[in-house]
Amino acid sequence: MNRRNFLSLTGTFTGGALLLPDFLHAFGSQQNLIIGDQCIVFVQLNGGNDGLNTFVPFENPLYYDLRPKIALSKDIVIGKNKGMAFHPALKGFAEMQQNGDLSVIQNVGYPEPNRSHFRSQEIWQTASDSNKYINEGWLGRYLDLQCKDHQPTAGINLDSIDNLSLKGLEPNSITVKNPNVFKTKNQKEEAGVLSDNPQLDFVRKVANSVTEGSDEIQKALAKSTAEISYPKTGLATNLAWIARLIKGNLNSKVYYTSLNGFDTHDNQLAIQNNKLTELNDALYSFYTDLKKASLMQNVTIVVFSEFGRRVKDNGKGTDHGTAAPMFVIGGNNKGKIIGNNPNLSDLDQGDLKYETDFRSVYASLLQKKLDFDYTKIGIQNKALQGLF
């Protein structure tokens, strides 16, 4: 079988309508059909978002001393709280925190940090130590254990490329750029003409999952509409699709999407303002949509980046750093600022020292929102306390 035929059977279409992850092993026995009404939506900020100019230590004079070219004036930051405040583009974030729906987890990172975009994203997506390599994503491992046989829409990635976080041994997730055109011809019929060669059983099962996933997504979309008008941006479009799938009772446990463009080595003030505006407007629309549908208690939104930026500016921008804030919205979180304000006088070779390991946040999400024992997927960090 050539590559073209294999891709047509597994549902990877050149038009970007659907991509399925690569799977490495045969299908094994599974446990426990996914149940429950909670789901988590992950928004990954690719490029390394500058946390210090996102959630700003505006009362710390070192912030202004170390960033003479890019520090944000205390007169323009918003939502001031305990010496910290939001970038002025994040008006929706400030309002969500005022409503008690947004928590900020400060100084999130991991030991022995890696400043490579690719490797640090891989560490976050697999929940590995920085010196270890894992083939499957942390959410993929969770779905493998929680799905009986397979459930092709247990995880949804709104993107044009697969996300390692959702990669598992079973076809329990689907990557789709535009769910509205996620309509395939009868893949089961094509899969049925395969030989009885056991090596092709995997192909047959994945091909059948394409059709099953397509049917489930179309049914969910048919039962829901967009209740509000979203901005005309890529992230907002993705979140609007996710909102419709949630309101249509697709019963996916995890959704994933991303926003590129945060690698601000130069011209940071303008670039980050534009990116944070897109993030704010898209997420606040999503929040408003789900709030109107009385679903925010069922949906937890997690916003993060693979690393922050160095504390001292390089002129008009910043270079790759380490620790940065994470944001958690909805899901009955406690709406708190968790952790100490960034310590700008005690740095690790010019970088912030991490205070909370990102895997402790993952552990809390799995334990509190998905009722899952996080140690079963290899997370040894204790769950973060005080988030939910």
Model-derived features with residue positions:
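Extracytoplasmic mature domains of secreted/periplasmic and thylakoid-lumen proteins
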Residues: Q31, M84-N186
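Anion-binding catalytic surfaces of enzymes that hydrolyze or transfer phosphate/sulfate esters
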Residues: L194-S285, D289
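Patatin-like phospholipase A catalytic core
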Residues: C147-T233
